[in-house]
Structures are given as structure tokens and as C-alpha cells.
Amino acid sequence: MVQSPMLSCPLKQTNEIDWIRPLKDYIRQSYGEDPERYNQECATLNRLRQDMRGAGKDSATGRDLLYRYYGQLELLDLRFPVDENHIKISFTWYDAFTHKPTSQYSLAYEKASIIFNISAVLSCHAANQNRAEESGLKTAYHSFQASAGMFTYINENFLHAPSTDLNRETVKTLINITLAQAQEVFLEKQVTDQKKAGFLAKLASQAAYLYSQAAEGIQEYAKGVFDKSWTIVVQAKAAHMASVASYYQALADSESNSHGVAIARLQLADKNSTAAMGWANLVDTIKYHQANVQVKLATFVKDNDFIYHQPVPNEAGLSAVAKLPAAKAIPVSELYQGQDIQRIIGPDIFQKLVPMSVTETASLYDEEKAKLIRAETEKVETADSEMAASLDYLKLPGSLNILKGGMDQEMTVDDEFRQWCQELAGHQSFAKAFDTLQDRKGEILSQLDRCSKQLDLEESVCEKMRSKYGADWSQQPSARLNSTLRSDIRTYRDTINEASASDSQLLATFRQYETDFDEMRSAGETNEADVLFQRAMIKAGSKHGKGRNGVGSPYASTQEGSLLDDVYDEGSLSVAEQIARVESILKKLNLVKRERSQVLKDLKEKVHNDDISNVLILNKKSIAGQESQLFETELEKFRPHQNRLLQANHKQAALMKELTKVYGDLLQDKRVRSEQSKYEAITRQRNTVMARYKKIYDAFNGLLSGIAQAQTFYTEMVETVESLKKNVETFINNRRSEGAQLLGQIEREKAGTATDQEDREREKLRQLMERLSTEPKPTSTPLPSTAPSKAKSPPPPVKAPGYPGPGIASPQMSPHFAPGVAGQQHGIPLSHSPAPYGQYVAPPSGVSYMQGQPFQQGAAAPLSEGYNPMAYPAPTSISPPPSQQYYSSTPAPYSGYSNPAPPNAPSQFMPQGYVPPPPPPRPQQPSYPPSTGPYPSGPGGYAQSRPYGTSQHHKTPSQSQSSSSTDPWAGLNAWK
């Protein structure tokens, strides 16, 4: 068949645009990133559009340039909304037929124009192929179909065409033309291959139909769009293809003895060829074809006139030639297969800017993959657990080893038992540890007893002094202050008693297992654990104990032959053969398990590497709302692995069924059952021995842990009781110092009272002498220096415990102590106000008391420390009377002075002429405590005190000795 020329669609032209600036502005505004980071990406897209404008019309390179730019536009559309409201870029394209410019801001218009040019390039590429060659013919056939597919994509996706060339009717006409030309190319190939006339007639009929459809479209809907030559060519080709169809159908009719019909068809073919002569370029082709038609027509007429004599129907009576479509539009998705898409389009230019929609869809697909993996993994784990449970129930393969070696297995020492003996080796007896614990406990109890005795002695002395001095002894009762200390002592005693109970339990455990400990320790040290194990087995009733040296115990039974040596009836399998069958099935099961694990591993790896991001990006709009169908399609690629896992599970079930039957038959053997009973008896004895020594070993570890805890407990208790002891000593020292000061004040008061009495007696004697004197009374008689008047002068100053106001020194007066003190009602600051010892806070069990700070004169006691009366400035006041809970100052007068009691007038009680005796000598007044240094002012607003023991209060060494000899508290010095 002579090749006819083909039509090709012209390309649309466009003006240059700038992608860079609008994209950078959008990246800055919408993505919040630095647009300078995307300079290269923006420049790449801009360069792709420039390259697309110069794409060749009839080359595959030009087609790929256009498709690369189009693919990047599809990817760009996922991230950047290019329209009039967002990224505003004016795209100007010229109509391919009328050459009129059209401008729009829509990216869809840009993509439609690119696809139109791809179709045009494909049609040009197909029309320029040399169809005389096999490769050229195939390329032309494929390119015409691909061009039709691109036009179809435009017709289906771009409904509102802004230009004439993109109009639906124009595009539909182009589709018919490209498909008709693809059909014609296929017909040429079949004519060359000399296919049957009927088949060729159908192909030509389809081509004629497509050309006629295109001709109608040009005449009805696209007038003024296509060039006039397109109309002539399409009409001429429609008539020519109809002539070819009639010609080959006539040949087919002649072969089927329809000679009259064949003649009529040849006449029709000749008529169509004459009509097709309208286009000059087809004249030669049509003339050649018409000559063939006329030759055949003359031959058929002659044969029919002389031979067949069949009537020749008219043209209207001929049936239409059947049509056979051989060309179809290739969709865009099939234009490039496999890796060609990635190779032509290249990587996503803006892949660093991931759209949220694609990410969400990909995450949904990942979840579907995860569900698949979880389901298959669960099935594999279930199958493995079922196999393990079944084998464990059958006691396989362990029981096979027993059967293969005979039931009389060597009862060697257990490795765990040997390890226990080795751990006990080298450990000393616990007796010494228990002795140490008892010693520590005794030491703690002794300390607690001493503390109690010291508190009892202090309390006894305090109450004796109160009994002696009555209301003058106003020191706080000890029972109120030492209650916390006594409570701590009781708590510690209770804690020690509880610990003693625990010690007794530990000791009982030690006594119970002492012999066993010694045996295991000796066995571990001499490496004779197997000997000890043998004795235990013999004691448990075993007759099969056997040591490492291979010497059987004296109670071992006579050795019998192995079960593998026994052969039964010829018609039955021996024990060895049955064991071999069981082992064979076990090997198959293990092989199935390994294969299943490997298939699951391969499936996980394949799922992990599966990525459909490109599919999601390229088909973003087409799969909208149909993600589940896409996921199902993509997951089908894992179906082979799932089938292999399913087959493995079925195979395992069949093997387990066979194993159960074979192994059950083996166990029903009489000899096997008899020997198995013996072995089970030995196993029970062995378990009994191991359970006994496990209990001993646990008791040993329990003793180690218990003694370690007891040692830690007693160590902490020693520290705690030592702290308690220091607190008790501090408390007693403070009480002693306070009592000593109180005793000194009482003695000084008594001495002051005696001095006042002496002065009053002297004054009365002087007045009596004046009355008895006959000399005239002088106006002013000074008293002798040896008898100073006490009416106007105060007694010798004594440092009184008065409460001076702020910044005012207290005058040195002898205090007057009232039996009832009510200073609590006035809130007067205290010169010394020790709180009851109840302020001591007992620490929790195991926690040491705060270390008592030794008293140091000249340093104020911090408020955070415990009770310490010695840390406050001297002189300190005495404790309040028993009726008071806390210390308080004396009542009014508030000036700090105490009014001495008025002396009694002896003249009212003595007879006339009574001469009083001379006054007794003034007693030496002791001072407590001895002055050893200055006393600082303490916290709480105490006034600064002068150093105690200065001026008239300074004592000589002899006086100090005399004072200490009469001090009832001096005996408490030995407490410390």
C-alpha cells in the first residue's frame, strides 16, 4: 500500500514570564521561610519554561522538555496556589490556528497550553516518521495515539477553554484526526504483511469512519479555525479509506462466491476514489489505488458474465463494511511507563516544601502498611506459639534424647546444685555474727539504762531542793522538761525489743540449717558437690545415682540394654525407626518455622522501602476521595508474601497432626512405657533433692541479707543512742547550772535579810544610848564608820535578776521573791526564759539526734539549737514555780527594782531595859556559777550584762572553796 502524507497540529506560542519573584514572595509570606534559600529552585523552574519555548516540533527531546515542565507544574500546584488571588502571574499564549493572544492568571491555562503543545509535538513527530521502516512505523503509530490521549486529557479536564484551539469541538476534531491517522498507519502495516482481505476491509472502514467524523467536525463546529487545506485532506482521506474498505471487502466477497456483491463494491470503490481526487498530494496514491480497482472490476465482470451469472446489486443495497478499531488514545498516565516519569520529570524542585495534604495521605498509607505488618506478625507469632505449646505438651525433643539413650539415664549432679555449694564455700559460720549483734544490743541497752538513771537522779535532786526551800525553789519540775527524752528512751527500748524478735527468728533459722550449711560449705571447698548429691539421692530413695568419676552407687540397679537395640515383630517398626520418623517430622517443622520467619522479614523490609509519594503527587487530583481504593491497589504488591505465610501455617498444621500420631504410637510401645515409668520415678526423686537444697540455699541468702540488715540497724542505733546520751548530758548540765544559780540567789537573799536585821538592831541601840545619855544631843551626830546607817542607804549591791528596760541598766538590789508570780499576764521580756524540754523534737527511728553543742561561755546559743540555759547572759532567773508552765518575769513594779521587806520593830516585843546582843558576823555570800568569763547578751531582747563577778562580787579562792563545799549540786559533776 502506498503511504499517504499525514497531518500534524501546529504549536501554540507564548511570551516570556518571570517565576522567581512571585514564588519568593509567597514563600516568605505563607511558609515563613527565607526565600533566599530557594534561589536555585526558583531559577530552575524559570529556566525550564524558557527551554520549553524553544522545544523542537518533531523530536522526542522537545516532547520531553515540555513534559518535564508540565510535571514540575503539577508538583508546583501542590505547594503554590497560582491564580489571581495568590501568586499572580499573567500567562499569555497565542492560538495555534488563529494566532490570537490570550492571557490568564490561572495555572490550569498554562498546563492546558503545555499539554496542547505536547500533543502537537507528538503529532509532528509521528507525521515525519519514515513508515517504510519498521521502527518508524511503530513510532508513528504510538505517537499518533499518544497525541490523541493528550488531546483527550484536555477535553476531559479543561472545560472552559479561553481560546479557540482549546475548545472542546476543536480538540475533539483533533482527536479524530490523530486516531484516524494511527488507524491508517496500522492498516499500512497489515497490508504490507498481506493479511486477509476481510480483516483489512474492517481496518480501512474504521479509518474512513474517523476521517468522516473529523470532516463533519471541521465543517459544523470549527469553521474558520482550521486551514482550508485541512478540510480538503480530511475529506479526501475519508473517501479514499472508504474506497480501500470497499476494495478489500469486494475481494472478501469474491472469495466467498458473492461475485455480484463484489462487483458492486468495486464499483463503489471506484466512485470513492474519483471523489478523493480533490487533493493534489493524494492524486498519485488515489490513481494507483483506482487502477487496481478498475482492473479487478473488469476481471470480476468478465468472470460473472461468463461463469457465475450473479445479479449485481445497486449501491444502496450494499451492506456497510464492518469496522475494526486498531487505534486508541493513550492516556497521560500510560505515556511514560515505570522509571521514565522520574527520569524525564526529574526530582521535585521544591521537595523541601512538603504540602500537608500529601503528607497526610502518605501517613494514612503508612498506617495501612503498619496494619498489614501487625496482622501478619500476629499470625506468625500465633503459629510459633502453637508449635511451641504442642512440642512442650509432647515433651519434644527432650524426651527423644531420653529414648535414644535408654531410660536409665546417668543422674549426675545438677549444675545449679554445684553452683550453690561453691557460693557457700569460704563463708564463715554465722555464730560470730550473732555474738557481735548481741554485744551491740547490750551496749545500746546499757546506754539507755544510764540515760534513765541520770534523768532519775536529776529529778530526785530537784525535788529534794524544792522540799528543802519550799516556794523559794522555783525551778521548773524536771518531769515536765524531760518527758521527750524519756519518751525517746522508751521508743528505743521498744525498737530494740522488736529487733531482738527478728534476731531470734534469724538465729532459729541458723540453728535449723546449720548442719546443712556446713555440708554444702565443705562440699564446695573440697569440690565434692557430686558426692553430697549422691548421698542426698540415696537418702531420697534413688538407686541410680552416679558420680562424675563414672562409679555407680552401691544401690544402682542392673544396667539393661538400650531401647534402640530391641527389635519386635517383623511386621512392626522398631523403636529406632519410630524415633527416626519423629525426628524427621521435627526437622520439617523447624524448617517451616525458619522459612516463615524469613518470609516475614522480607515482607517487613519490602513494606519499609515502599514509597508511593510520587504516585500521590502525580495523581493528587485524580485520587481525591478515592484514597482507600488506591491503598488497596498498592497493597496488592505484598500479596505473594502473605500467601507464602499462609501456606507455611497450613503445612505446620499438617506436620503437627502427623507428629502427634507417630509420637503417640511410639509412647504406646510396652517397653517404652515400662522404662518411662522408671525414669519418671528417678526424676521425682531428683526434683525432691533439688527442692530441699533450694530451700537451704534460699535460707542461706536470707540469713546473709538479714544479718547485714541487723548490722546496719544496730550501727545506726548506736549512733542514735549516742546522740540521745549527749542530749541527756546537755539537759542535766543546763539544769545543774540553773539550779546552782537559783541556790546562790536564795542564799544571797537570806544573807541580805540578816544584814538588814543587824542594821536595825544597831539603830535601835544607838537611839537607846542617846536617850540614856545625860549629855545634850548635838545638832548632827555622824555615825561611826563601823556602823553605817541602813535607813537611807541600800544594802551592798548584789547583781539582781531584774528585767531592765531597753537601754537602761538594772540597779543592783537584793530581790524580793513573792510566792506567787503572775508575770505571765504582762508579757514582760525575760532575762532568761528556757522553754520546757518538750521543745526537743524526737527524731524518727534510725535517725540520730542533733549533736549537742558543748556549752561555751561568751557565745550566744543559736535559736535553732536545743534547750541550753547556759548559753544565755548571766544572771539568769530561776525556773517558775510548779504552778507555772513557762517562765515569766516578776510582777510590778516594772522599774526593775525589788522593795525589801520592812524590818520588824523589836521594841514592841522586848521588855523594858533589854539590851540586844551584838549582831552576828555577816555570812559570806557564794556566787553561782563561778566567774570564768564574760556572759554575752542572748537572743530575745536581753540587755547587755556586765561581766559577772566584778567589784564587790569578786570572790577569793577560799570563798570559792567554801561555796563549793556547801553546794548540793556539786555531786552532779560526776554525771558527765
Curated annotation (Swiss-Prot):
<keyword id="KW-0967">Endosome</keyword>
<feature type="coiled-coil region">
    <location>
        <begin position="748"/>
        <end position="775"/>
    </location>
</feature>
<keyword id="KW-0963">Cytoplasm</keyword>
<feature type="compositionally biased region" description="Basic and acidic residues">
    <location>
        <begin position="746"/>
        <end position="762"/>
    </location>
</feature>
<dbReference type="Pfam" id="PF03097">
    <property type="entry name" value="BRO1"/>
</dbReference>
<feature type="compositionally biased region" description="Low complexity">
    <location>
        <begin position="775"/>
        <end position="792"/>
    </location>
</feature>
<feature type="compositionally biased region" description="Low complexity">
    <location>
        <begin position="851"/>
        <end position="862"/>
    </location>
</feature>
<keyword id="KW-0653">Protein transport</keyword>
<keyword id="KW-0813">Transport</keyword>
<feature type="compositionally biased region" description="Low complexity">
    <location>
        <begin position="884"/>
        <end position="895"/>
    </location>
</feature>
<feature type="region of interest" description="Disordered">
    <location>
        <begin position="769"/>
        <end position="976"/>
    </location>
</feature>
<dbReference type="InterPro" id="IPR025304">
    <property type="entry name" value="ALIX_V_dom"/>
</dbReference>
<feature type="region of interest" description="Disordered">
    <location>
        <begin position="743"/>
        <end position="762"/>
    </location>
</feature>
<feature type="compositionally biased region" description="Pro residues">
    <location>
        <begin position="914"/>
        <end position="937"/>
    </location>
</feature>
<keyword id="KW-0175">Coiled coil</keyword>
<dbReference type="Pfam" id="PF13949">
    <property type="entry name" value="ALIX_LYPXL_bnd"/>
</dbReference>
<feature type="domain" description="BRO1">
    <location>
        <begin position="5"/>
        <end position="387"/>
    </location>
</feature>
<dbReference type="GO" id="GO:0043328">
    <property type="term" value="P:protein transport to vacuole involved in ubiquitin-dependent protein catabolic process via the multivesicular body sorting pathway"/>
</dbReference>
<dbReference type="InterPro" id="IPR038499">
    <property type="entry name" value="BRO1_sf"/>
</dbReference>
<dbReference type="GO" id="GO:0005768">
    <property type="term" value="C:endosome"/>
</dbReference>
<dbReference type="InterPro" id="IPR004328">
    <property type="entry name" value="BRO1_dom"/>
</dbReference>
<comment type="similarity">
    <text>Belongs to the BRO1 family.</text>
</comment>
<protein>
    <recommendedName>
        <fullName>Vacuolar protein-sorting protein bro1</fullName>
    </recommendedName>
</protein>
<comment type="function">
    <text>Involved in concentration and sorting of cargo proteins of the multivesicular body (MVB) for incorporation into intralumenal vesicles.</text>
</comment>
